């Protein structure tokens, strides 16, 4: 299957799944679902998943070249490393001299581990703590601002987490001219940032419970009241984690693709300008 066809098929499958899910989510309330509600859910939440799935399918199929599955795994694991092209070629050449299915799979697993631990993985881990701190501080500030004002809840700003994660992935993908670097950094930023949000939200949920008696995620007052501080904390942890992942999960892929594409376009422009310049 060609990369383009793989992307189209994957996108169609994910879109169909989100169409069904969007209809179910739209009908989760007291009223019957409407086409507009389902379409808005698919467009606002599902469409990023469709595009991200198409990007991943295209890149994986394009990179997966080899005589068997271990060779394709190594090819995918070593793809997208502009500063490690020789390393990837050396690994693929070494695999070609390994006989036996078990030995080839062990080698492929080692290549995957090395690809995840080294290079862009080290950069991503180095930025995890600063990202955690920034998201935690912003969550605390947003919590206190909302508590003193309209009390709409932290869920109102959850899409900002997705955009910030996408921005990190795009910046790293552009700077490193690598989709892989952007993807790894974006995924790490998502994990670290969401951890910062959830950690602070869990603590602040008790403050919202004590001062206003409302849920921190949406500012709603439950009919029977909040049973205990523990219930407020559980709602904050489960709600912010689930909605954070729901909205932000595709954005490391989208940001990395955008950053790498922008870097590639800029490099192509520079090459054309250099080729058109008169030689001294």
Spell out what each predicted region is.
Residues 17, 46-129:
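Negatively charged linear elements and acidic catalytic determinants
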Residues 3-13, 20, 27, 109-168:
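Transmembrane alpha-helical insertion/packing segments
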Residues 31-47, 156, 224-259:
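Hydrophobic alpha-helical transmembrane segments
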Residues 24-38, 147-149, 183, 191:
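Membrane-interfacial hairpin junctions
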Residues 2-3, 55-69, 79, 116-123, ...:
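Cytoplasmic membrane-interface segments at the C-terminal ends of transmembrane helices
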